[in-house]
Amino acid sequence: MLKTLSLHACAAAFVLTASGAMAAPADDAKAHFQAIGSGDLTTLMSSYAANTQFNWVGGPLDGTYASAEAIRGVWEKFTKSQGPLKVTMDKLEESTNPKGSTVSANVQFEGKAPIKVRYVLTFREGKIVSETWQIDPKLAMAAAY
């Protein structure tokens, strides 16, 4: 009886630990956006896979970046020039299959001026492998309450 109870307790602890260890891609995307807003480079860089491709479309940082060093350089320039930003998200959607997940969202970063971005992140094995930051000044955002 005690052995059976111990096995059930161990199994329950394993399930709780395993399920708590992996956040949903939508949650990871939200954390990524918040890290951008707060300028937290450590959190930002820890979310990338080794072979991430980052496409920044529009604005002074326009380009494709394909190494951790290049991506860090972009975020260093951006966070230095912008400072802390208020982050507003709208229309966040997640698509998942066994090979990975894609999260898309309308995101507004607001500091010196509002920066409206159509964001697309692709995750594989819990890490970002593709990131697209599309600046879109006409992007519609839901009204904040």
Residue ranges of predicted features:
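A short gly/proline-enriched turn/hairpin at secondary-structure junctions
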Residues: 53-66
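N-terminal signal peptide c-region/cleavage motif recognized by signal peptidases
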Residues: 18-20
